[in-house]
């Protein structure tokens, strides 16, 4: 197994994986991912890396509050329930920070009503976990394309 690196704010930790999370294609664009399960983090990190993004792992809404204003944030992917909150709080923090960072929510229990609620509250999309990594990559790429089309003058934060 190869060693790969997940990036934590102000720190880094290594995780073993079959493929490296970073391939040098990210050009400084970051994706914040909020998850509490290490297996989920690994799966999402690899998918985001394949989208050309540098995955930055967070596990709490408090960590998000301190990181969201940093430059290069292109997209945010979050688990439905976190250690100190949930996706609704993540959406509020993202909206309050300004900018137009697309938020993709994933849930183990997602149903149609939850999907509609997440989108109504401002999520770009809500995926049921486990999902295929290709599905997540497609949603993230679509979110980035729509953000570029809607806000062409906005620099990535």
Segments from the language model and where they lie:
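Conserved phosphotransfer cores of two-component systems
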Residues: 69-71, 93-100, 121
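Non-catalytic signal-transmission and effector/linker regions of two-component phosphorelay proteins
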Residues: 1-47, 51, 141-157
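Conserved phosphotransfer microenvironments
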Residues: 41, 74-94
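Acidic, metal-coordinating helix/loop segments flanking the phosphotransfer/catalytic sites
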Residues: 57-75, 82-85
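C-terminal output helix
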Residues: 131-140
